[in-house]
């Protein structure tokens, strides 16, 4: 695979981007041409009717807003908890540390289908089903373990001498963490935020099983609304998919800028 990428990088890019191109192509193809024209790289006539219908005549704007709230909140809380846990695992030795790490790893071994029923029974009496809060809690709980290990790897790469020098100059542990460690780990924080945001944005199983109300549904569940018993509205479904990709692309463009800033800031401060 590595040799193929080195010898044919252009083909790999085409292979990776073609599904996105086809998504866009179907989203602008009128319904009367979807099946009558056969397989074409570009429709003979393009239209934006599918986008207008998705925005004006469906609940997709509500699903989009719910996904944005859930994914953003989950990313912020998960990164905050993961940064604290990763820093603790990296810098401190305490009794039971490896047991805790092992238990966190074990939580990643169970398939989600196996634990969806217990989670539902746990959230139901608390009134957290059919709510965005319940999704945020579940998503945060499932993303924190991996995010913690990800953050720990970044903290491990930073020499402890930097903190010790700051503490010798009179800074306490928190001040050293905030002024020295955080700027150096901005790339790690950005990567963690991006990973958790993407995972929460595209998650379907919990969003489908824990919510039966459209008021608390996210866009992966909303895409199923374009599938009826006897037909599938491919045009509107693809248009909704394109609209759902936009915030993720914009988010990673924003994160990419901060990745570069974090690397340069770390080099200067180090």
Regions found by a protein language model. Give the residues of each.
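A structural signal for multi-pass alpha-helical bundles of membrane permease subunits
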Residues: 2-270
